[in-house]
């Protein structure tokens, strides 16, 4: 049921060229996407960090050239990626600032997923986490901050003032046992994400709503349906196009559901239907950029060969993991 993927990629043993590999895959299946490389120093120090920044810049320039050539559908965009700030020293933030400035793209970063990220910023830099990023001009209306569970009040105010986005990843937070974000109702631009825990956004909205209620939160399904559809605004800001409505001038990206509703399905109650009834099993077809990429519950490419390759790669990975032990 997804028409677009916003990706935060990491492959420390394969940095240069990795984003182009992802772009090839997105174009093959016809998905719209925005991707970046997760810049960090946690595996190989400043060298790894510099290589990550360079890959982000290289890929953004590749996208610019592809747009000018206009020989392929404009389905893939670039962000400038960074891992949690506790693995990006000030020298790295300066590199990221230059990358954002040089490419005109926004920052995609995971922040305050754990309390350590915040305390590290206070201990080593004497600043709130997002205030530190803002010092390097890294918080603006194209910025995507994932998680943000432990952002202090001043950082939330800064996020809202700069018109940036916070992406809430309920299932990932539960899986990693990092806690709960009790400040969702304070966020101006809230969207939902998976952080790689599946790709089912129907399911993600259900978990986001029910976990919120379990934590004593005040929001109802309509707030989470709004967060679900806010992904369209994220895409609009970065693609320079309009998404999310069946109107002239909007991109023809849509999901068609075959949902036999037991009660009236109306604009006023569709959020409740998504929370309590409708799911990805209801998806009949998906259109991206006016092209059917999933029709009558069938993909238009060979899934079997992709799955076979994935199983082979998974087995190889586990053999390498066993060798480490």
List the model feature ranges, each with a label.
Residues 228-325:
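Active-site microenvironment of metallo-dependent hydrolases
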Residues 145-153, 167-179:
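C-terminal active-site-proximal or functional interface alpha/beta core segments in diverse enzymes
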Residues 1, 26, 80, 110, ...:
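Divalent metal-coordination and catalytic microenvironments
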Residues 115-127, 155-160, 177-187, 197-216, ...:
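Histidine/acidic-residue-rich catalytic or RNA/ligand-binding cores of hydrolases
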Residues 39, 113, 170-175, 194-198:
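Short, acidic/turn-prone active-site loops that include or flank metal/cofactor-
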Residues 135-138, 142, 182-261, 278:
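His/Asp/Glu-enriched, well-ordered alpha-helical/loop segment
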Residues 9, 14-152:
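Metal-coordinating catalytic core of metallo-dependent amide/deamination hydrolases
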